[in-house]
């Protein structure tokens, strides 16, 4: 009895010591994972576990997203997971997504896994039409997506229809034109073929470099009202805060870069923005829900922090990551070059093999022809020899007949003819015998000449037979494989060798020399756009090519706005924001209040 009680106590003790857990499902852009989490875990514990599992070190761009009553929310790092307003049914589901976007993907995204996750997310946003993308740019982006998935274009492998099951273009773009899937595939493939030699990470980065210049890239939109009650849209992104007309999400009416904002706070549904210049009055707006204000503040804090970080020297961790990325890139470049060399050598060997097979077949044909010529020569020689023998026998026979005729003539001459009639008759016979003898002599001479000619022809035929045998012998003894020229080894590649105080809902931004740094960033953007001149020409060419197939009645409001901007010689997103910030902050605040 005592033993049973002790056993139950021991089991209860073990049960109490065993940590209680709950199941979490994490959904990324291309996978799902499940984890057992302890009840006491905070958001940071779960977030760090996911990042370690993915091998992700650039954690500052990402977050765990969930939905509360149709409103997006993000897991807070310092709050217990189960203290969030999430479903208590297991598994608790979160989406691992990019929360903040870089200003320049090529400069800021270091790890390949980071680039890949951004690529998948931005691609989905474009296909789901959460980011507006013009038709011609959609085709170009699709070609890079195909390069990332399939590698280099190979006509023997990527035959017509190989993209039939792929989702590559927004449905809006497909419905806008009278074009068959085959016509779209043809245009995508034409660009896809030009991307030869780009690895998956390079193709994905080219995709992001184009996508980041789209007007709606990286912008979170929120419905707000100003003091006058005018319905507007607030856009929060990596560059600052932007105010939009609800009917036009492409071009902001006003912009406030992060370097002009000193403090952001909210009370209930009212949001307050304090400009850096204290002489300028604050401006306020109202959102629809308190929960939305919390989200806006989170995005403002995170984007401002990254805005500041970009304009400072890289931390030691980032420097190490960039160094490792450079080494990895150099290693992959060497590997690609090695594979390219091997592929080149293999193709060269295959070409040499094909050439040898072709030459061998040619030599076999030549040998067959030589054999046939030899056989014909032998047959001709046999026929000539036989004909010469017959002619020689005929000549002998004629000579014998001529001798007999001569003897007959002599016999007749020796015979005495007594009567005149017999004499005349004999003279006639003698004359006939002489004519016959003359003809026999001429025929004999002709036959003799013909025999000589046949002997000469026989000699020539035997000479031709000898030459044919000699050529056949040369073909038989000729080397089958010609010497191969060594492939020169390529030269070795160059190897490059806001803080939140307590629980207050306010955030102060520190002053810094932001304008100068912003100008430097803008300068880099301008240089990038200059390099993209050829790309823009290609886009314009495709736009012109498919314009005749457009169904105008199917254009959306954003299509019309984009076309109007283009017709006015619309500039890039960054240039548009720069123009909007040329006015003083005071005048922009006043303009916002009067909207």
Swiss-Prot record:
Phosphorylation of Ser-518 inhibits nuclear localization by disrupting the intramolecular association of the FERM domain with the C-terminal tail. Ubiquitinated by the CUL4A-RBX1-DDB1-DCAF1/VprBP E3 ubiquitin-protein ligase complex for ubiquitination and subsequent proteasome-dependent degradation. This is Merlin. It comes from Papio anubis (Olive baboon). The lineage of its organism: Eukaryota, Metazoa, Chordata, Craniata, Vertebrata. It comes from the Eukaryota. The modification Phosphoserine is found at residues 13, 518. Residues 22-311 form the FERM domain. Probable regulator of the Hippo/SWH (Sav/Wts/Hpo) signaling pathway, a signaling pathway that plays a pivotal role in tumor suppression by restricting proliferation and promoting apoptosis. Along with WWC1 can synergistically induce the phosphorylation of LATS1 and LATS2 and can probably function in the regulation of the Hippo/SWH (Sav/Wts/Hpo) signaling pathway. May act as a membrane stabilizing protein. May inhibit PI3 kinase by binding to AGAP2 and impairing its stimulating activity. One of its GO terms (molecular function) is actin binding. Gene3D superfamilies: 1.20.5.450, 1.20.80.10, 6.10.360.10, Phosphatidylinositol 3-kinase Catalytic Subunit, Chain A, domain 1, Pleckstrin-homology domain (PH domain)/Phosphotyrosine-binding domain (PTB). It is a peripheral membrane protein.
């Amino acid at each position: 009895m005592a033993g049973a009680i002790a056993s139950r106590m021991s089991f209860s003790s073990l049960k109490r010591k065993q940590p209680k857990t709950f199941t979490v499902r994490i959904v990324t852009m291309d996978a799902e994972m499940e984890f057992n989490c302890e009840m006491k875990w905070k958001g940071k514990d779960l977030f760090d576990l996911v990042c370690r599992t993915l091998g992700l070190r650039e954690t500052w761009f990402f977050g765990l997203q969930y939905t509360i009553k149709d409103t997006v929310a993000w897991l807070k790092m310092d709050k217990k997971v189960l203290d969030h307003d999430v479903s208590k049914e297991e598994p608790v589901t979160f989406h691992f997504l990019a929360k903040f976007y870089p200003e320049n993907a090529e400069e800021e995204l270091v790890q390949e896994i980071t680039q890949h996750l951004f690529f998948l997310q931005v691609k989905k946003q474009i296909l789901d039409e959460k980011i507006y993308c013009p038709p011609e740019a959609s085709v170009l982006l699709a070609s890079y997506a195909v390069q990332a998935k399939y590698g280099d274009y190979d006509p023997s492998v990527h035959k017509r229809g190989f993209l039939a099951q792929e989702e590559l273009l927004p449905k809006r773009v497909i419905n806008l034109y009278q074009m068959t899937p085959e016509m779209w595939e043809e245009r995508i493939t034409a660009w896809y073929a030009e991307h030869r030699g780009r690895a998956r990470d390079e193709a994905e980065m080219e995709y992001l470099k184009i996508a980041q210049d789209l007007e709606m890239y990286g912008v979170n939109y929120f419905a707000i009202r100003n003091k006058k009650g005018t319905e507007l849209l607030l856009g929060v992104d990596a560059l600052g805060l932007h105010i939009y007309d609800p009917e036009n999400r492409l071009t902001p009416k006003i912009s406030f870069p992060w370097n002009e904002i000193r403090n952001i706070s909210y009370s209930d549904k009212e949001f307050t923005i304090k400009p850096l210049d204290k002489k300028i009055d604050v401006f306020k707006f109202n959102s629809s829900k308190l929960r939305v204000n919390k989200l806006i503040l989170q995005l403002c804090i995170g984007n401002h922090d990254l805005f500041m970080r970009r304009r400072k020297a890289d931390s030691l961790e980032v420097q190490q990551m960039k160094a490792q990325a450079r080494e990895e890139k150099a290693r992959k470049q060497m590997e690609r070059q090695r594979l390219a060399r091997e592929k080149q050598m293999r193709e060269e060997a295959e070409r040499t093999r094909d050439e040898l097979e072709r030459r061998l077949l040619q030599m076999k044909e030549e040998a067959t022809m030589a054999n046939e010529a030899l056989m014909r020569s032998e047959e001709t020689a046999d026929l000539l020899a036989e004909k010469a023998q017959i002619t020689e026998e005929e000549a002998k026979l004629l000579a014998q007949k001529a001798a007999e005729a001569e003897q007959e003539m002599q016999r007749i001459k020796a015979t005495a003819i007594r009567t005149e009639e017999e004499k005349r008759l004999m003279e006639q016979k003698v004359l006939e015998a002489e004519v016959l003898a003359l003809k026999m002599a001429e025929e004999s001479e002709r036959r003799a000449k013909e025999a000589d000619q046949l002997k000469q022809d026989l000699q020539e035929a035997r000479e031709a037979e000898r030459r044919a045998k000699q050529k056949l012998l040369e073909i038989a003894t000729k080397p089958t494989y010609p010497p191969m020229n060594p492939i020169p080894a390529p030269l070795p590649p160059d190897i490059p060798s806001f803080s939140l105080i307590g629980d207050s809902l306010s955030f102060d931004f520190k002053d810094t020399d932001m304008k100068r740094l912003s100008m430097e960033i803008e300068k880099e953007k301008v240089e990038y756009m200059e390099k993209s001149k050829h790309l823009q020409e290609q886009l314009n060419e495709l736009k012109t090519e498919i314009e005749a197939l457009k169904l105008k009645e199917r254009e959306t409001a954003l299509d019309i706005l984009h076309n109007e901007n283009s017709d006015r010689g619309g500039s890039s997103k960054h240039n548009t924001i720069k123009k909007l910030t040329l006015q003083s902050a005071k005048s922009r605040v006043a303009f916002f209040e009067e909207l």
